[in-house]
Regions:
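Active-site-proximal cofactor/substrate-binding loop regions of enzyme domains
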Residues: 2-111
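Extracytoplasmic
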Residues: 43-45, 72-75, 117-119, 174, ...
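Short loop/turn motifs enriched for small/polar and acidic residues
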Residues: 80-83, 125, 158
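Short, conserved sequence motifs used for protein processing/export or organelle targeting and
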Residues: 93-115, 127-256
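Ligand-binding face of N-terminal immunoglobulin V-set domains in extracellular IgSF glycoproteins
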Residues: 122
């Protein structure tokens, strides 16, 4: 049960996003390639999803790019290990079929940049795809493909009651709010396959994702309960507002 004082604090923080369409800044210059920080033109965090695999010899350089970019407050980086290279003999210990299905859905819808199902692939805001090891291209994707959703997520810590989540903005189609649990850093000793004998570190590796609510634009609120933050192996959580079926990402933000 959430007490009245806690809920009032949440509502007060949420009210600030009511005018999101006019409150967002128009532009922020992109950072230089060598700078570890990443800038979004709208000032809202940009989602970068890295489709990677322990069975892909081309993936470790992309995993390093993900680790380099992840600390920036301007992005939400999530590693999504896929299952389709398991057939080569080494079963990826982090792979999820849901990751493979999302990548396939992106390819069916069609991304700008380099579309298709391959690894390593970085997908920016569900709109732009490129080889995940090409850092400059990933950064260009952040600069050119953010803010198109005209939406925002705001979070208010409710202490023992979880987190209050406020949504604001517009959408042309019904979107869904998704809670994603990740492990900040996972070091894996790969026993065989193309990367056999190597130890690779994965950043913000997805453990589980749960659909919280649908959204049709305007102001909306939701509470993420403590029980929803008990995903096995997860020590960080992100919120993603996206059109379903491999549709574009409208907003993303770290919950904690």
């Amino acid at each position: 049960m959430i007490d009245k004082r806690t809920m009032l604090a949440f509502v007060g923080g949420f009210a600030a996003i009511g005018a999101i369409a006019v409150a967002l800044p128009h532009s922020v210059p992109a950072q230089a390639q060598g700078d570890a920080r990443v800038a979004s033109p709208t000032g809202e965090p940009v989602l970068i999803e890295l489709f990677t695999s322990q069975g892909c010899s081309s993936c470790p350089p992309a995993d390093k790019v993900a680790a380099k970019m992840a600390p920036s407050p301007g992005v939400v980086v999530i590693s999504r290990p896929v299952t389709y290279w398991d057939r080569l003999g080494w079963k990826d210990t982090l792979a999820k079929e849901a990751n493979t299905e999302l990548q396939q859905a992106y390819a069916r819808r069609g991304l700008s940049g380099q579309n298709g199902v391959y690894t390593p692939q970085a997908v920016v805001n569900g709109r732009f795809g490129t080889v995940g090891s090409r850092e400059l291209e990933v950064r260009r994707g952040v600069a050119h493909n953010s803010g198109a959703g005209n939406a925002a997520i705001r979070v208010n810590d409710l202490g023992a009651n979880g987190y209050g989540v406020g949504l604001g903005g517009d959408t042309a189609k019904t979107a869904e709010l998704v809670l994603i649990g990740v492990t900040r850093e996972v070091e894996v000793a790969i026993g065989s396959g193309e990367n056999g004998g190597r130890t690779v570190t994965y950043t913000n590796a997805l453990r589980d994702e749960t659909r919280l609510a649908s959204w049709n634009g305007g102001k909306a609120s939701h509470v993420v309960t403590p029980a929803q933050l008990r995903v096995k192996g997860a020590n960080r959580y992100a919120l993603v507002l996206r059109e379903p079926g491999g549709g574009p990402v409208l907003a993303a933000r770290w919950l904690n």
